[in-house]
Amino acid sequence: MKAVCNAFFGFRAMGRLGRDKHFYDYVDDREDSGKNIKAIADYGLTHVPSYDNPFINYICLNSYPAHALPFYLRRENVELIKSRLDRIEVRHCDLLGLEGKFDFFNLSDIFEYMSGDAFLQNTAKLCELSNPGARALYYNMQNKRYFADSRLTLQKELSETLTNNNRAFFYRDCLVYVFGEQDEQSDP
């Protein structure tokens, strides 16, 4: 099993058969990427409940059974979601070209796909765009990218809880930073 995971989830195979090969241009530890993904998946598949996990069910069954619907598809959440749609402003764009001030950023795993210099530029721009107390959430999958800017404070306990209970089990870290708060700063 180890050899299969190392072969299939290694950057060479993933670049040919899965994700765009350029997604691996900036992976920190390319030679061990298969081993790293296997370790993350092993944890997720053995420590995170799978029966009602929408990600595992969709990956395995190509559908969501009724017992494993994501929150946004559950009937009991429809009215709540509808009532809060005005709170969300979706911007699909390059962070560096964005203008304005924001309270929350869901950055997914964008930092996987850029150079270290681009990461620093995007970090500076994020700080420029952040209102005091703004939060930024992002994932590390194969890279280990952490904000070093003193204006951004890692919410370590929350980040560890989210990482350890992340139902999208294939990420190394789920990180939450707050702009302008210095009470819980720590290095991962």
Regions found by a protein language model. Give the residues of each.
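A short acidic, Gly/Pro-enriched loop at the edge of an enzyme's catalytic core
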Residues: C93-N106
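A short glycine-rich, Lys/Arg-flanked "PGG" loop and its adjoining helix->strand segment in the class I
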Residues: F119-P132
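Core SAM-dependent methyltransferase catalytic element
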Residues: L158-P188
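Conserved beta-strand signature within the Rossmann-like core of class I S-adenosyl-L-methionine
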Residues: P132-K144
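Residues lining the SAM
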Residues: S108-F111
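Active-site-adjacent loop/helix micro-motif of nuclease/hydrolase catalytic cores
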Residues: K101, M114-F119
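Conserved SAM-binding strand-loop segment of SAM-dependent methyltransferases
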Residues: R87-C93
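Class I S-adenosyl-L-methionine-dependent methyltransferase module
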Residues: M1-I81
